[in-house]
């Protein structure tokens, strides 16, 4: 490394000079794009030419085969202008097959080349062979059909997930929930349906702050829900601003002791590095106290009565409150799963209370509720839901 402030310190005077370098570099790349090995042409039938990139090349090949010629673009920025002109001059009709926004199509048309694209193909969702064949040819491709329909598998929180009890209580209380990115985003799905908004990482707290200041939503009937790793990633500054700007709402930090959704990565609150080495553990409660938050509670979210009482207490305060709903992710290897529950069918009254938590291990039959013991983790939440003592614990 060599010190070069003129290159690396982007103060206005330096930025103006570096802008010239960037534009020259981009111009050089544009000239190279025409000979770039990532851009390939395949000529077959020249009545139709397909311009595509990525997976749409494979789909198009399966639909049109040798009945079309192809320009597969591997370098999409900058686009290979001369290669595009040369390809289009050798085919009678051009169709740009690209997913979502018509980036390549708009560029081709700006070059004065007539082509089809989004006038035939949808601007939404990802493509498939069926979509391309139907939109361009008006035909359905031939596929091997399955004798049985594949069952629907909607995304769902795992059996024993510590977020489940929290969202059950929030739904029961009827509060507005500003959500965030993580496993707990699934709190928006049936039967819980507790999350009202989710935008991006950290937006739960900032969004709640905005609700406080803009009005229209009672701050004492609204909460933010954010995970421990997301809080460390981009929630800390939002909470600090809530305190600074005298907001009045409750922030719930759902601490499952890991970064769950993306594959159990460590984070600053777990006490381990990404390599698994022991390191200093950032205490969420200490951060909250350092901001001057007086009401900081730590509650096990599976203790739904305590959690409900704690949320009600925090919502009644004229200040920022924090509840840390702390229970480790059930998929952590150190979490014991040495028991499971069954349903005593003689006691079951088919009231459906156990179904309200949305546990995938529980289903309802003509004879009452049934628990799949291979899925049950013994979290006890269903036992707390049942008013008739139907749930019976078994050892593994």
What is the predicted function of each stretch?
Residues 1-157, 162-166, 175, 179, ...:
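Flexible, low-complexity linker and terminal segments
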Residues 145-205, 214-217:
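Active-site diphosphate/adenylate-binding microenvironment
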């Amino acid at each position: 490394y060599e010190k070069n402030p003129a290159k690396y310190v982007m103060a206005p005077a330096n930025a103006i000079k570096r802008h010239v370098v960037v534009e020259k570099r981009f111009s050089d790349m544009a000239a190279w794009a025409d000979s770039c090995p990532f851009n390939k042409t395949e000529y077959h039938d020249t009545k139709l030419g397909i311009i595509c990139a990525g997976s749409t090349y494979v789909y198009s090949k399966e639909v049109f085969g040798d009945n079309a010629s192809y320009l597969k673009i591997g370098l999409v920025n900058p686009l290979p202008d001369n290669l595009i002109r040369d390809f289009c001059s050798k085919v009678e009709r051009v169709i740009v097959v690209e997913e979502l926004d018509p980036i390549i199509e708009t560029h081709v048309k700006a070059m004065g080349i007539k082509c089809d694209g989004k006038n035939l193909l949808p601007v939404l969702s990802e493509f498939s062979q069926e979509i391309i064949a139907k939109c361009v040819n008006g035909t359905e491709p031939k596929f091997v059909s399955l004798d049985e329909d594949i069952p629907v598998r909607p995304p769902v929180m795992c059996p024993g997930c510590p977020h489940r009890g929290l969202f059950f209580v929030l739904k029961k209380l009827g509060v507005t929930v500003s959500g965030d990115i993580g496993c707990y985003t699934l709190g928006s799905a049936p039967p819980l349906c507790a999350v009202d908004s989710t935008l991006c990482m950290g937006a739960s707290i900032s969004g709640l702050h905005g609700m406080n200041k803009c009005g229209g939503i009672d701050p004492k009937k609204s909460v933010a829900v954010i995970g421990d790793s997301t809080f460390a990633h981009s929630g800390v500054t939002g909470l600090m601003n809530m305190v600074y700007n005298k907001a009045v709402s409750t922030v719930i930090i759902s601490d499952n002791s890991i970064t769950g959704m993306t594959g159990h990565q460590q984070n600053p609150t777990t006490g381990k590095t990404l390599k698994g080495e022991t390191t200093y553990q950032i205490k969420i409660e200490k951060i909250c106290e350092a901001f001057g938050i007086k009401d900081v509670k730590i509650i096990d979210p599976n203790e739904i009565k305590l959690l409900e009482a704690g949320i009600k207490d925090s919502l009644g305060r004229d200040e920022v409150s924090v509840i840390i709903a702390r229970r480790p992710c059930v998929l952590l290897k150190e979490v014991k799963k040495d028991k499971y529950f069954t349903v005593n069918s003689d006691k079951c009254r088919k009231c459906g209370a156990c179904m309200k938590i949305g546990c995938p291990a529980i289903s309802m039959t003509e004879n009452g509720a049934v628990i799949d013991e291979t899925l049950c983790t013994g979290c006890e939440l269903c036992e707390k839901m049942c008013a008739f003592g139907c749930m019976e614990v078994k050892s593994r």
